[in-house]
């Protein structure tokens, strides 16, 4: 997951109380933008961001991007996680945001090794073994963080160029395609066994 800011200035929270929404619940204090109705607020590392999140699934050996998805920033990372799994992987490496018991069980049922970092909670601290496991998984996850660094630093995805989720999703897919083409050009040719 990586937060991407929209091309417009984020709206400020409203000063007046608002009536309940159509579902009867109180409206969010952080309103949506009138110019970009698909963008939403999120909080990451103590900072608030308004915009979108990019999610990618890559091949561990070649660093080829296999799946990608753009969501609004309010979507939890666990929601699009299953869409990033192609199904033919031997193992899935992911950070703590993707850790769910159902996901681990689903991966095992599909004969995929779940290498998801363990998440501590207020009732149970991580054991030393789980901490070592998280360190090992963190080292294997480095290629996906490099993809995000390239998307933001070289391709300018730190800020969304377009208004709307669909246009930004298309832009993300085109950038991933460009990155894959550049990556394929430097990969060694696959050995053919007869």
Where do the model's predicted regions map?
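Short hydrophobic/aromatic-enriched beta-strand-loop microsegments
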Residues: 110-118
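Structured core elements
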Residues: 55-57, 67, 93, 115, ...
């Amino acid at each position: 997951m990586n937060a991407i800011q929209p091309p417009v200035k984020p709206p400020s929270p409203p000063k007046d109380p608002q009536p309940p929404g159509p579902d009867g619940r109180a409206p969010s204090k952080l309103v949506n933008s009138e110019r970009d109705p698909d963008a939403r607020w999120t909080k990451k590392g103590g900072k608030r961001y308004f915009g979108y999140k990019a999610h990618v699934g890559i091949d561990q050996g070649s660093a080829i991007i296999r799946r990608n998805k753009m969501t609004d920033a309010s979507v939890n990372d666990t929601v699009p996680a299953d869409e990033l799994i192609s199904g033919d992987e031997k193992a899935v490496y992911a950070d703590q945001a993707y850790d769910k018991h159902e996901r681990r069980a689903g991966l095992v049922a599909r004969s995929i090794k779940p290498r998801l970092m363990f998440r501590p909670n207020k009732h149970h601290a991580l054991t030393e073994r789980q901490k070592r496991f998280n360190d090992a998984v963190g080292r294997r996850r480095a290629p996906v963080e490099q993809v995000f660094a390239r998307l933001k630093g070289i391709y300018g995805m730190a800020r969304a160029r377009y208004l709307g989720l669909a246009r930004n999703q298309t832009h993300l897919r085109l950038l991933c395609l460009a990155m894959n083409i550049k990556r394929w050009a430097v990969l060694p040719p696959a050995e053919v066994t007869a």
